Amino acid sequence: MTQVAKKILVTCALPYANGSIHLGHMLEHIQADVWVRYQRMRGHEVNFICADDAHGTPIMLKAQQLGITPEQMIGEMSQEHQTDFAGFNISYDNYHSTHSEENRQLSELIYSRLKENGFIKNRTISQLYDPEKGMFLPDRFVKGTCPKCKSPDQYGDNCEVCGATYSPTELIEPKSVVSGATPVMRDSEHFFFDLPSFSEMLQAWTRSGALQEQVANKMQEWFESGLQQWDISRDAPYFGFEIPNAPGKYFYVWLDAPIGYMGSFKNLCDKRGDSVSFDKYWKKDSTAELYHFIGKDIVYFHSLFWPAMLEGSNFRKPTNLFVHGYVTVNGAKMSKSRGTFIKASTWLNHFDADSLRYYYTAKLSSRIDDIDLNLEDFVQRVNADIVNKVVNLASRNAGFINKRFDGVLASELADPQLYKTFTDAAEVIGEAWESREFGKAIREIMALADLANRYVDEQAPWVVAKQEGRDADLQAICSMGINLFRVLMTYLKPVLPKLTERAEAFLNTELTWDGIQQPLLGHKVNPFKALYNRIDMKQVEALVEASKEEVKATAAPVTGPLADDPIQETITFDDFAKVDLRVALIENAEFVEGSDKLLRLTLDLGGEKRNVFSGIRSAYPDPQALIGRHTIMVANLAPRKMRFGISEGMVMAAGPGGKDIFLLSPDAGAKPGHQVK
C-alpha cells in the first residue's frame, strides 16, 4: 500500500523537572516512540520532540530544600531524564526545557497576541495565602476536597478523580501543603485568559470526529457545565517567566508548559540552521500534522486551553490528541512500600528496555484504558512471545544454514504461498500500528509466528538433516524459516529496536517495510549469535527489592520528636488489648518528701481509689493545680513497691521529660472509670 509522504510533528507530555522518570511515564513515551518509528518506516518526515516542564513553585521550593538554585536542579534533572529515555531507546529528535530563551520569547509572543486581541482580562481576586510561610499558595500547594465530585485530598487546580478544574478557593476544607496551615484570603490582581470566547470553536473541534470518543464525551460535559476564564498569572515568589510590564507577576506554569512544544521544535530548527520549518509546522494554514501523546489527567489543559491559546494567537491547532490511561502494577496503584513504584533507571538495572516496550505495546489500544503491568505475566509473555516464538524461529534454522551451507540461503522459496500470507498481513498490521491498536498488531504478528513455527515443526529440518541426498530440501526449509523470521522482525521493528539491530546484523540486511516484498534468496547471512535471553521471576524479585531499598535510601530524614525518640517495634492487637486504660479523677496531688521528681496522686476510678506516684514534679511545681482534673491511667499495671509506698498504676503523659511533660486528659464528658478504647 503506497502512502504519500507526510510531515508530522509528535510530542509527549513534558515530564516535570522535580522527580525521576518512572514506569508510569514510560507508557506514554514508549507508545509515542512505537508510533513514530512506524511512521518513519513508512517514509514520513517525523519530528519527535519533548522537553522538561521546568517552572513552578514546587521546583522553587525543592531547590531551596536541596540548597541549590532552581537552574542547577532542573539542569541535573534534565540530564537524568534524557539518560532514562535514551536507555529505553526513545528516538527523540530534540529534548529541551521550558526554561529556555525560545520558550520565553514564544510565551511572551503568544501572551501579547492574546492581549492585543482582547483575550486577556485583569481583575483583583481573593487568593489563598499561607500565613505561616508568608506566601500566596500555588494551586498544587493547596489540598482539599474536590468541589465537584467531593473526592478528598485533591490539588487546588484540578481533580485527579473526576478531571474537573477549578479555583483553589473552591476547594472544601483547604490546607497548605507547605505548612499544613489553614490558608487565609488575600487580594491580588491577576490576569485571565478568556476561554469562554472560544467555546464555539472548541465545540466544532470536538464534533470533527478526530478526537477519541472518550475525550469528546468528556469535553461535552465541560461545555455543558460552562467554560470559565482561566487564571494565567502567579504572584512572586515564583520560578518562571515574569509577565511583560507586570512586575512581580509570572506566567502560570500551565501557560508556558505547552508552549514548550513549540520552544523545543524552535530549538531543533535553530540547531539545524533551518529558519523555515518552524512556520511550516506552526503557522495557521500549516498542512503538517501535529499530534500530542498525553495522559488522561491533563486532557482539560490540552483539549481546551491549549487549542484556544493557539487559535487566539494565530497559530495552528493540534491535528489530534492521543490520550492514554494510567499504569498499575500487579493490579494496584504503584506503591513505594511494595516496591512497585519503579524508576526507569532501576528497571534498566534488571531488565532490558525491549522487554517493557513489548509488554506495554501488547496491552495498548486506541482507548483510554489503564494498563496493568503484571510482573508474573510480563515474564511469561516475554519468554513465550519474544524468545519461544520469534527468536527461536531464527535459532532453530540458522545453525543448519551456517554449518551446512556456509550461511547462504536457498535461491528459491520453499513455500511461496506461506510467504505471501506473511507479506499480505502488512496492510492489517500497518493499519493497527497507524491507528494505535497496538495490541491488535501484536496479536496478528504472534499468529504469524505460530504459523512459522508450525511450518518448521512439520518440515522437521533436524530429521531432514540426517537423511542423505536431502541437502537442497534442508537448505530450502531453513531458508524459509529465516525469511519468515525476517518478516516478523520487520513488523516488530517499531517495538524492539535493540533486538532489531541484532537481527539485522545476523540477517546481514536492513529491515524495511517495503523490503519484505522481496525475500532473501541466495543471500549470505552472518554467523548466528544469541539474540535474546530468557528472563525469570528472580529478576523481578530483585527489581522489587531494589525499588524498596531506593525508597529507604531517599526517604526524608526524620525530624522533630521522632528523631530523638523513634517509634518502638510493632506489637500485635492482642498485646495492646491487655493494657486497660481508664479515665481517673485527680482527687489530691502533693509533693513526696525525700523526692525531687515525684508527686503523690490520689485517683478516683469511679468507686475505687488508687495511690499513684508519678515523676511529673518538674512540670507541675504547684500540685494543687492538678486537683479536679481528669487524666488517663493504666489501671491494670501490677502494683509497685517503692521507698515512699506502693504505686497502684501509672498516669499517662507526653513529652521528652523535665519541664516538658504534659499530663493527658480526656475530652469533656468522660467520667472516672470509663475505659479508653
UniProtKB/Swiss-Prot annotation:
UniProt-annotated binding residues for Zn(2+): C146, C149, C159, C162
Cofactor binding notes: Binds 1 zinc ion per subunit.
Secretion signal span: none
Placement of sequence motif 'HIGH' region: 15-25
Sequence motif: 'KMSKS' region, positions: 333-337
E.C. no: 6.1.1.10
Catalysis performed (reactions): tRNA(Met) + L-methionine + ATP = L-methionyl-tRNA(Met) + AMP + diphosphate
Needed cofactors: Zn(2+)
GO biological process, one term: methionyl-tRNA aminoacylation
Pfam families: Anticodon_3 (PF19303), tRNA-synt_1g (PF09334), tRNA_bind (PF01588)
Enzyme class at the top of the EC tree: ligase
Positions of ATP binding: K336
Span of domain tRNA-binding: 575-677
Keyword set, alphabetical order: Aminoacyl-tRNA synthetase, ATP-binding, Cytoplasm, Ligase, Metal-binding, Nucleotide-binding, Protein biosynthesis, RNA-binding, tRNA-binding, Zinc
Record-linked InterPro entries: aa-tRNA-synth_I_CS, Anticodon_Met, Met-tRNA-synth_bsu_C, Met-tRNA_ligase_1, Met-tRNA_synth, Methionyl/Leucyl_tRNA_Synth, MetRS_core, MetRS_Zn
Quaternary structure annotation from Swiss-Prot or TrEMBL: Homodimer.
Role: Is required not only for elongation of protein synthesis but also for the initiation of all mRNA translation through initiator tRNA(fMet) aminoacylation.
Protein family (similarity comment): Belongs to the class-I aminoacyl-tRNA synthetase family. MetG type 1 subfamily.
Name of the protein in its database record: Methionine--tRNA ligase
